[in-house]
């Protein structure tokens, strides 16, 4: 039996609210801003913490081929709904902290879209995820992260340690709650 994405979201939220890090799934306006710089013909894209698939749907709507999109989701409740909703997209149940060891399996990526709640994570976990993500990104690639705060949810110490910079792309006031989107890239590029 199919489980609706919202049922999966609220089940996960009730079970582990800090792990989910949101009170409702991200909205369409946020999804459009998060994916606005990713060209459909650019290459492979990795999505971390896709949840109900709002960013996934936006990427596919922009024309990204399903074969070029891989979703990494740890929460068991989201796996089957994602596979049912996006049957041609690769969905991996994996901890994003393991990205650095997945290069052979995942290959190089042109972009990473992250829905992970970094504000609820220890700094060493954020460092492992972002550092692992950049080990997969091609030169010139970017890591897109949203946050409900005004500043980037990747701490400045982590950015500095990894040789990265964060630039705010915009704020979506009509999201619940309002959210900011950041593009994280290598300093030398």
What are these language model-derived features?
Residues 82-83:
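Conserved SAM-binding loop
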Residues 1-40:
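S-adenosyl-L-methionine
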Residues 75:
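Conserved SAM/SAH-binding beta-strand->alpha-helix loop
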Residues 171-189:
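Core SAM-dependent methyltransferase catalytic element
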Residues 53-57:
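Glycine-rich SAM-binding Motif I of class I
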Residues 127-139:
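A short glycine-rich, Lys/Arg-flanked "PGG" loop and its adjoining helix->strand segment in the class I
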Residues 137-148:
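Conserved beta-strand signature within the Rossmann-like core of class I S-adenosyl-L-methionine
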Residues 42-51:
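Conserved class I S-adenosyl-L-methionine
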């Amino acid at each position: 039996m199919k489980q609706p994405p919202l049922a999966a979201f609220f089940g996960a939220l009730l079970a582990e609210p800090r792990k989910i890090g949101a009170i409702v799934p991200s909205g369409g306006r946020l999804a459009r801003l998060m994916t606005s710089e990713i060209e459909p013909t650019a290459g492979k894209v990795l999505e971390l913490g896709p949840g109900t698939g709002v960013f996934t749907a936006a990427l596919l709507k922009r024309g990204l081929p399903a074969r070029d999109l891989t979703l990494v989701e740890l929460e068991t409740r989201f796996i089957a709904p994602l596979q049912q909703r996006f049957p041609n997209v690769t969905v991996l149940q994996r901890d994003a902290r393991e990205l650095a060891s997945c290069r052979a399996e995942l290959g190089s990526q042109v972009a990473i879209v992250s829905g992970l709640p970094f504000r609820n994570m220890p700094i060493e976990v954020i460092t492992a995820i972002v550092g692992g993500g950049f080990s997969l990104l091609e030169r010139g690639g970017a890591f897109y992260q949203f946050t409900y705060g005004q500043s980037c949810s990747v701490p400045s110490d982590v950015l500095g340690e990894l040789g990265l910079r964060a630039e705010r792309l915009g704020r979506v006031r009509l999201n619940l709650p309002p959210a900011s989107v950041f593009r994280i890239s290598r300093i030398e590029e």
